[in-house]
């Protein structure tokens, strides 16, 4: 019974390797250097598919992958339909923040009821956050270089992931509001969990035992 695990390249993959090892799964190739999108492992019945981070939940939802690892940010934007989320893996940690150009008085703008333009890759998270605060916003969906938006007058603020804050500082932006903590989660196709329980559950147990504190 073949198991397919959806992963994305980069930080999440690197921090997933010890968890895979705990489950006895070792990739046959390094996806960072391989052009292959389907990578075998030391188990003939386990394969990895390498996809964009934002596509991991979709591959799992529709059964193209049985399991996947995705950031909480991606899962919120996706909506989580058809997914079982049994485990917070405590990897790839960062924070979702509101950031503005240095010198912009965000609190004053909020207090006076200004309608703010918000640039973000995460419209669902941003919309929910500002709705809870009762702040009127126009969401501008971007796919990269969020930090540029306030500098050229496209937006008053951005909603983005912040790890060290170095990129914000380099572009004279400052984080002004914390929205949520982000880490990566293990997600499982709900139908696959029933049909392939004997194959999937040992992987879940091994991951649970290896999650960093």
From Swiss-Prot:
InterPro entries: ATP_PRibTrfase_cat (IPR013820), ATP_PRibTrfase_CS (IPR018198), ATP_PRibTrfase_HisG (IPR001348), ATP_PRibTrfase_HisG_short (IPR024893). Its EC number is 2.4.2.17. Pathway: Amino-acid biosynthesis; L-histidine biosynthesis; L-histidine from 5-phospho-alpha-D-ribose 1-diphosphate: step 1/9. GO terms for biological process: L-histidine biosynthetic process. Its main location: cytoplasm. One of its GO terms (cellular component) is cytoplasm. SUPFAM superfamilies: Periplasmic binding protein-like II. It catalyses: 1-(5-phospho-beta-D-ribosyl)-ATP + diphosphate = 5-phospho-alpha-D-ribose 1-diphosphate + ATP. Heteromultimer composed of HisG and HisZ subunits. Catalyzes the condensation of ATP and 5-phosphoribose 1-diphosphate to form N'-(5'-phosphoribosyl)-ATP (PR-ATP). Has a crucial role in the pathway because the rate of histidine biosynthesis seems to be controlled primarily by regulation of HisG enzymatic activity. Belongs to the ATP phosphoribosyltransferase family. Short subfamily. This is ATP phosphoribosyltransferase. It comes from Chromobacterium violaceum (strain ATCC 12472 / DSM 30191 / JCM 1249 / CCUG 213 / NBRC 12614 / NCIMB 9131 / NCTC 9757 / MK). The gene is hisG.
């Amino acid at each position: 019974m073949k198991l397919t695990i959806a992963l994305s390249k980069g930080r999440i993959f690197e921090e997933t390797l010890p968890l895979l090892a705990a489950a006895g799964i070792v990739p046959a190739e390094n996806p960072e250097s391989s052009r292959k999108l389907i990578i075998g492992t030391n188990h003939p019945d386990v394969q990895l598919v390498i996809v964009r981070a934002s596509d991991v939940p979709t591959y799992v939802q529709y059964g193209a992958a049985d399991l996947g690892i995705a950031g909480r940010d991606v899962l919120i934007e996706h909506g989580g339909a058809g997914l079982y989320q049994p485990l917070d893996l405590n990897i790839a940690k960062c924070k979702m923040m509101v950031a503005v150009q240095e010198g912009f008085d965000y609190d004053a703008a909020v207090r006076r009821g200004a309608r703010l333009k918000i640039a973000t890759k995460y419209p669902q998270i941003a919309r929910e956050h500002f709705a809870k605060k009762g702040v009127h916003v126009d969401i501008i969906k971007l796919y990269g270089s969020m930090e540029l938006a306030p500098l050229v007058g496209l937006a008053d603020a951005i909603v983005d992931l912040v790890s060290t804050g170095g990129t914000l500082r380099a572009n004279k932006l400052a984080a002004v509001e914390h929205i949520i903590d982000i880490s990566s989660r293990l997600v499982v196709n709900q139908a696959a969990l029933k049909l392939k329980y004997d194959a999937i559950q040992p992987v879940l147990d091994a991951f649970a035992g290896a999650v960093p504190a």
